[in-house]
Amino acid sequence: MDFKIEYTWDGFPVRHEPVCVRLSPCEQGVKMEVSAPLFNDPPSPLGEPGKPFSELWNYEVVEAFFLNDTTKQYLEVELCPHGQHLVLLLAGRRNVWKKELPLSFKASRGGTNWEGEAYIPWSYFPPNVTKFNSFAIHGSNDRRVYEALYPVPQHELQQGQKPDFHRLEYFKPFSFNTLLGEEWRQPEPDLW
């Protein structure tokens, strides 16, 4: 499954090549591949590449959210072009109950682009994922840019509204069966 992040969080077209996120099956879960422009702004976090980094959303990242719309349990995966990552399990909007889970992730940077490859184990996904959204963040201070696969519709924007990627009502339907076939059933996660 391929996704292109072509809009800002509030529904305006991005002004660069879109961030691409690809999800594909792998032996023990899902492979998430990112191909994105490299802004290198802000600079790299001080954390070690390949390791979890707290509050990674304050840096340049691409994020994927996998939601069970009934229970409001969701998985958040954040990937950074400098090799750091952050995996969060949430039960209810913004209610983190597990954080900084390990992840097999590697990133490579070219002059103007970066690519990343992460292997997300089935145990991290909440049971019965039904919705999805993906985001990209880059820039510093007043140049900070927030982008969304499924943005807030412009007619629903409120004056003074700020970006909030935990607005679960804007996520769109998603099924692993599209990726893995109609007969496939999600393995029971042992973390949830």
From Swiss-Prot:
Belongs to the UPF0462 family. The gene is D3Ertd751e. It comes from the Eukaryota. The lineage of its organism: Eukaryota, Metazoa, Chordata, Craniata, Vertebrata. This is UPF0462 protein C4orf33 homolog.
